[in-house]
Regions:
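HAD-like aspartate-dependent phosphatase fold
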Residues: 1-23, 27-159
Length: 159
């Protein structure tokens, strides 16, 4: 019988094939992996399942997350992640194809968008028809000013 941390029956998990897992506060806290995480992920794979880490934190790229969890001992590659940055890139491709996006966000967010074929600018440009604001751990007053300038124009606004 498969049991959880509290010795309760967890056999129902054996038949699940896909686990969507949040990261910070669920499998780790900042840079410390929670006890039992590696065993849990290993058990998923032993049972023929797959796990995907999901996050609404747009400040890091998939590459950043892969490196972070690998440092903690978790074997994962880009196929193990779905981030809000990726979802935003897909949304922009679908709803604003070929348009230029002004982005107020981290360098990782900008890189993630560019890797997904989005033309991104970080300074006010007339060519930008979409303003995107992401969680920005690198925010400056200049970025806020530039974003305000862009929002004063006729642009689509996403956050």
């Amino acid at each position: 019988m498969l049991t959880d941390k509290f010795k309760k029956n967890a056999d129902a998990l054996r038949h699940k094939k896909l686990f969507l897992l949040d990261m910070d506060g669920t499998i780790y806290n900042e840079n410390s992996i929670f006890e039992g995480t590696l065993d849990f992920l290993s058990q998923i794979e032993k049972n023929g399942g797959r796990y995907i880490f999901i996050t609404n934190n747009s400040s890091k790229s998939v590459k950043d997350y892969v490196e972070k969890v690998n440092r903690m001992g978790i074997t994962a590659d880009a196929s193990h992640f779905y981030t809000s940055s990726q979802a935003t890139a897909f949304y922009l491709q679908e709803n604003y194809p070929g348009q230029t996006v002004f982005c107020m966000g981290t360098r990782s967010l900008v890189a993630e968008l560019e890797q997904n074929g989005i033309r991104v600018v970080t300074k006010p440009e007339d060519s930008a028809s979409v303003v995107l604001i992401g969680f920005d751990t690198e925010n400056t007053s200049e970025k806020v000013r530039d974003t305000c300038i862009m929002l004063g124009r006729e642009v689509a606004y996403l956050a």
